[in-house]
Amino acid sequence: MKKTILSLTMLLLASAGFAQCGKNAGYEVKAENAYTNYNVRYASNPKDAKNYDTKRLRGEFAIEKVMVPGQVNWTYTMFDRFLIGGAVPTATPLKLTSIAPLYTEKPNDQKNLLDNRELGIINVGGEGIVTVDGKNYTLGFQEALYVGRGAKDITVASKDAAKPAHFYMNSAAAHKSYPTKKVTLKEANNIKAGSLKESNDRVIHQLIIDGVAGVRTCQLQMGVTELKEGAVWNTMPAHTHLRRMETYFYYNVPEGQKILHVMGEPQETRPIWLNNEEAVIAPEWSIHCAAGTSNYTFIWGMAGENLIYNDMQVVKIPELK
């Protein structure tokens, strides 16, 4: 009888653990304040990930809620402690505050979002203003702002509430403070890649890259890739980079169209369908490429152990499965 009770108790405890694990696997959104929400995604093993069904795969890697009017939404992934976020200020400016997973109640711990972090912001909406410790930076469409570690008071606002700014944000851990710097598309390192014949004619705009346009970063890299009309594939041939993780944020996706994002190990690929203004996490072990039912634009953001943009393991197209 005692053995039976003990077995039942252990089973109940295990079930409770699974329930909690499910909550923490990206399914539970928590409120930090009246307008800021966040969720946490834990790192995963490729041996496990290849067995995920569609719901679990999306729960771990897809980020559907990025841009919501009047809100700041963050996803905190344990892959390189990376933050993926969106802010859409309307009539009222929004302050970028820290979130619970980034601080404790201990003295001298991180109280401001960038006490131990750096931040990249790219605007994909109407004209907006980012204020960093009292200094205003106006960001037009596809203009970027790098904000260095130690900035305390950061707010975002739209110039016209009827045409609000859509600020897409990435943040990574930082060991040093570098100056805040705005970067326009003209100042970016603009690279033509692919061809229409290969269905991947595109322009890569390197915006927040260490050394580009006078920007210095600790580990954060961000940029925009625009596909030309008639092109549908991005990042093909595909690649991985074991020294960095990456995220993609898709936008300029026409109404009624979708993105078929491909992830996983090169011989164990899996599809994730995404809509306009949705994002996806790519672990260091995963390829990250996509085809759209129309051309589109996306923002890539990376963080990891080095700053060499071309440090990657290219996968030959015939090797993909």
Segments and roles (model prediction):
Residues M1-A25:
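Bacterial Sec-dependent N-terminal signal peptides
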Residues A25-T104, N108-Q110, E118-L119, L320:
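Hydrophobic, proline/glycine-rich low-complexity stretches
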Residues K65-P107, R202-E246:
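A short glycine-rich, His/Asp/Glu-containing loop-to-beta-strand
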Residues Y76, D80, R216-A279, P283-I287, ...:
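Acidic/His-leaning functional-site neighborhoods
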Residues L113-F141, Y251-N276:
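A short beta-strand-loop-beta hairpin characteristic of the jelly-roll/cupin
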Residues L139-K159, W273-S294, G301-A303:
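Conserved metal-binding segment of the jelly-roll/cupin
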Residues A157-Q221:
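Surface-exposed beta-loop interaction hotspot
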Residues A161-P179, N295-V314:
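A short hydrophobic beta-strand segment most commonly corresponding to one strand
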